[in-house]
Protein backbone atom coordinates (compact mmCIF):
# COMPACT_ATOMS: atom_id res chain seq x y z
CA UNK A 1 0.00 0.00 0.00
CA UNK A 2 1.26 3.50 -0.89
CA UNK A 3 0.35 6.66 0.97
CA UNK A 4 1.08 10.03 -0.65
CA UNK A 5 1.20 12.79 1.97
CA UNK A 6 1.66 16.42 0.96
CA UNK A 7 2.64 19.54 2.91
CA UNK A 8 2.51 23.19 1.86
CA UNK A 9 5.42 25.59 1.90
CA UNK A 10 5.16 28.64 4.18
CA UNK A 11 2.73 31.42 3.31
CA UNK A 12 1.05 34.55 4.62
CA UNK A 13 4.21 36.09 6.05
CA UNK A 14 5.20 33.03 8.07
CA UNK A 15 8.77 31.72 7.77
CA UNK A 16 7.77 28.12 8.48
CA UNK A 17 4.78 25.88 7.79
CA UNK A 18 4.25 23.25 10.49
CA UNK A 19 2.34 21.13 7.99
CA UNK A 20 5.43 20.58 5.85
CA UNK A 21 7.81 20.28 8.80
CA UNK A 22 5.63 17.61 10.41
CA UNK A 23 5.30 15.71 7.14
CA UNK A 24 9.10 15.55 6.93
CA UNK A 25 9.19 13.86 10.36
CA UNK A 26 6.73 11.05 9.61
CA UNK A 27 8.17 7.52 9.28
CA UNK A 28 8.45 6.19 5.74
CA UNK A 29 6.65 2.99 6.71
CA UNK A 30 3.51 2.92 8.86
CA UNK A 31 1.62 -0.32 9.50
CA UNK A 32 3.25 -1.80 6.41
CA UNK A 33 2.27 1.10 4.16
CA UNK A 34 4.94 2.99 2.22
CA UNK A 35 4.73 6.73 2.92
CA UNK A 36 5.79 9.07 0.09
CA UNK A 37 6.18 12.76 0.98
CA UNK A 38 5.66 15.73 -1.32
CA UNK A 39 6.14 19.46 -0.80
CA UNK A 40 3.58 21.54 -2.67
CA UNK A 41 3.42 25.31 -3.28
CA UNK A 42 0.80 27.47 -1.60
CA UNK A 43 -0.42 28.47 -5.02
CA UNK A 44 -3.84 27.96 -6.58
CA UNK A 45 -3.88 25.39 -9.40
CA UNK A 46 -0.11 24.72 -9.31
CA UNK A 47 -0.52 22.84 -6.03
CA UNK A 48 -3.07 20.53 -7.65
CA UNK A 49 -0.95 20.06 -10.75
CA UNK A 50 1.99 18.93 -8.64
CA UNK A 51 -0.17 16.42 -6.75
CA UNK A 52 -1.65 14.98 -9.93
CA UNK A 53 1.84 14.60 -11.43
CA UNK A 54 2.87 12.60 -8.37
CA UNK A 55 -0.30 10.49 -8.50
CA UNK A 56 0.50 9.60 -12.09
CA UNK A 57 4.08 8.76 -11.12
CA UNK A 58 3.51 6.54 -8.07
CA UNK A 59 -0.14 5.39 -8.28
CA UNK A 60 -0.92 5.77 -4.55
CA UNK A 61 -3.76 4.08 -2.70
CA UNK A 62 -4.22 7.00 -0.32
CA UNK A 63 -3.63 10.75 -0.72
CA UNK A 64 -3.55 12.97 2.37
CA UNK A 65 -2.84 16.69 2.17
CA UNK A 66 -1.72 18.61 5.25
CA UNK A 67 -2.16 22.34 5.84
CA UNK A 68 -1.76 24.95 8.56
CA UNK A 69 -4.84 26.39 10.28
CA UNK A 70 -3.56 28.95 12.76
CA UNK A 71 -5.90 29.34 15.71
CA UNK A 72 -6.96 25.71 15.98
CA UNK A 73 -6.26 23.83 19.19
CA UNK A 74 -5.69 20.37 17.74
CA UNK A 75 -5.12 18.25 14.67
CA UNK A 76 -8.31 18.38 12.60
CA UNK A 77 -9.20 15.97 9.79
CA UNK A 78 -11.53 17.75 7.38
CA UNK A 79 -14.97 16.37 6.55
CA UNK A 80 -15.81 18.32 3.39
CA UNK A 81 -14.42 20.66 0.72
CA UNK A 82 -16.50 23.15 -1.28
CA UNK A 83 -16.28 24.20 -4.91
CA UNK A 84 -15.24 27.77 -4.20
CA UNK A 85 -12.05 29.81 -4.14
CA UNK A 86 -12.47 32.99 -2.07
CA UNK A 87 -9.01 34.08 -0.99
CA UNK A 88 -8.70 36.49 1.94
CA UNK A 89 -5.01 36.93 1.11
CA UNK A 90 -2.84 36.37 -1.96
CA UNK A 91 -1.20 33.01 -2.54
CA UNK A 92 2.57 32.78 -2.95
CA UNK A 93 2.41 33.95 -6.57
CA UNK A 94 0.07 36.88 -5.98
CA UNK A 95 -3.15 35.17 -7.03
CA UNK A 96 -6.31 36.10 -5.11
CA UNK A 97 -9.38 34.49 -6.70
CA UNK A 98 -12.66 35.70 -5.25
CA UNK A 99 -15.90 33.72 -5.58
CA UNK A 100 -14.56 31.46 -8.34
CA UNK A 101 -15.49 27.81 -8.83
CA UNK A 102 -12.54 25.42 -8.61
CA UNK A 103 -13.99 23.18 -11.32
CA UNK A 104 -16.99 24.30 -13.36
CA UNK A 105 -18.12 20.70 -13.87
CA UNK A 106 -17.55 19.68 -10.26
CA UNK A 107 -20.09 19.03 -7.53
CA UNK A 108 -20.89 21.79 -5.03
CA UNK A 109 -18.89 19.83 -2.45
CA UNK A 110 -16.99 16.59 -2.02
CA UNK A 111 -16.67 14.67 1.22
CA UNK A 112 -13.46 13.04 2.40
CA UNK A 113 -13.56 9.27 2.00
CA UNK A 114 -11.03 8.79 4.79
CA UNK A 115 -12.14 7.39 8.18
CA UNK A 116 -11.97 10.80 9.84
CA UNK A 117 -13.61 9.77 13.11
CA UNK A 118 -11.35 6.74 13.46
CA UNK A 119 -8.42 9.09 12.86
CA UNK A 120 -9.59 11.43 15.61
CA UNK A 121 -10.12 8.54 18.03
CA UNK A 122 -6.65 7.14 17.35
CA UNK A 123 -5.10 10.51 18.07
CA UNK A 124 -7.13 11.28 21.18
CA UNK A 125 -6.55 7.79 22.58
CA UNK A 126 -2.83 8.49 22.30
CA UNK A 127 -2.90 11.92 23.92
CA UNK A 128 -2.98 14.15 20.83
CA UNK A 129 -5.73 16.83 20.84
CA UNK A 130 -7.88 16.24 17.75
CA UNK A 131 -11.38 16.77 16.41
CA UNK A 132 -13.34 16.61 13.16
CA UNK A 133 -13.47 19.90 11.27
CA UNK A 134 -16.43 20.81 9.09
CA UNK A 135 -14.77 23.59 7.12
CA UNK A 136 -11.49 23.62 5.23
CA UNK A 137 -11.80 27.35 4.52
CA UNK A 138 -11.75 28.89 1.04
CA UNK A 139 -8.00 29.33 0.50
CA UNK A 140 -5.48 26.92 -1.06
CA UNK A 141 -6.14 24.19 1.53
CA UNK A 142 -9.78 23.84 0.50
CA UNK A 143 -8.68 24.25 -3.13
CA UNK A 144 -6.37 21.24 -2.83
CA UNK A 145 -8.81 19.10 -0.85
CA UNK A 146 -11.62 19.79 -3.31
CA UNK A 147 -9.37 19.39 -6.32
CA UNK A 148 -7.97 16.03 -5.25
CA UNK A 149 -11.45 14.70 -4.43
CA UNK A 150 -12.65 15.98 -7.82
CA UNK A 151 -9.86 13.98 -9.47
CA UNK A 152 -10.80 10.94 -7.38
CA UNK A 153 -14.43 11.31 -8.45
CA UNK A 154 -13.60 11.79 -12.12
CA UNK A 155 -10.44 9.79 -12.71
CA UNK A 156 -8.80 7.97 -9.78
CA UNK A 157 -11.81 6.17 -8.37
CA UNK A 158 -9.87 3.69 -6.22
CA UNK A 159 -7.96 6.33 -4.28
CA UNK A 160 -8.96 7.33 -0.76
CA UNK A 161 -8.26 10.99 -0.12
CA UNK A 162 -8.72 13.80 2.34
CA UNK A 163 -7.16 16.69 4.21
CA UNK A 164 -5.84 17.39 7.71
CA UNK A 165 -5.31 20.83 9.22
CA UNK A 166 -2.72 21.35 11.95
CA UNK A 167 -2.18 24.20 14.46
CA UNK A 168 0.63 26.70 14.73
CA UNK A 169 3.81 25.58 16.49
CA UNK A 170 4.98 27.60 19.56
CA UNK A 171 7.58 29.63 17.62
CA UNK A 172 4.78 31.05 15.46
CA UNK A 173 2.72 32.43 18.35
CA UNK A 174 5.42 34.32 20.26
CA UNK A 175 3.85 37.59 19.06
CA UNK A 176 0.29 36.26 18.82
CA UNK A 177 -1.15 36.50 22.36
CA UNK A 178 -3.83 33.96 23.34
CA UNK A 179 -3.27 31.93 20.16
CA UNK A 180 -3.07 28.15 20.61
CA UNK A 181 -0.14 26.09 19.40
CA UNK A 182 1.14 22.51 19.43
CA UNK A 183 4.66 21.11 19.40
CA UNK A 184 5.92 19.91 16.05
CA UNK A 185 6.57 16.50 17.60
CA UNK A 186 2.93 16.17 18.66
CA UNK A 187 1.73 17.30 15.24
CA UNK A 188 3.94 14.72 13.53
CA UNK A 189 2.74 12.04 15.94
CA UNK A 190 -0.85 12.99 15.18
CA UNK A 191 -0.24 12.59 11.46
CA UNK A 192 1.45 9.24 11.99
CA UNK A 193 -1.51 8.04 14.09
CA UNK A 194 -3.91 9.32 11.42
CA UNK A 195 -2.16 7.28 8.75
CA UNK A 196 -2.27 4.24 11.02
CA UNK A 197 -6.04 4.67 11.42
CA UNK A 198 -6.51 5.05 7.66
CA UNK A 199 -4.49 1.94 6.88
CA UNK A 200 -6.33 -0.15 9.48
CA UNK A 201 -9.88 1.12 8.80
CA UNK A 202 -11.53 0.65 5.41
CA UNK A 203 -14.71 2.15 6.86
CA UNK A 204 -15.21 4.85 9.46
CA UNK A 205 -16.46 4.26 12.98
CA UNK A 206 -19.84 5.49 14.25
CA UNK A 207 -19.27 8.08 16.95
CA UNK A 208 -20.17 11.70 17.58
CA UNK A 209 -17.96 14.12 15.69
CA UNK A 210 -20.32 16.91 14.75
CA UNK A 211 -20.78 20.43 16.03
CA UNK A 212 -23.82 22.51 17.02
CA UNK A 213 -22.63 25.49 14.98
From Swiss-Prot:
The keyword Protease applies. Removes 5-oxoproline from various penultimate amino acid residues except L-proline. Belongs to the peptidase C15 family. Its main location: cytoplasm. PROSITE patterns: PYRASE_CYS, PYRASE_GLU. Coiled coil: none annotated. GO terms for biological process: proteolysis. Homotetramer. Pfam families: Peptidase_C15. The gene is pcp. It is found in: Cytoplasm. The keyword Transferase does not apply. Its EC number is 3.4.19.3. HAMAP family: Pyrrolid_peptidase. GO terms for cellular component: cytosol. SUPFAM superfamilies: Pyrrolidone carboxyl peptidase (pyroglutamate aminopeptidase). It catalyses: Release of an N-terminal pyroglutamyl group from a polypeptide, the second amino acid generally not being Pro. This is Pyrrolidone-carboxylate peptidase. Keywords: Cytoplasm, Hydrolase, Protease, Thiol protease. GO terms for molecular function: pyroglutamyl-peptidase activity. The active site is at 78, 141, 165.
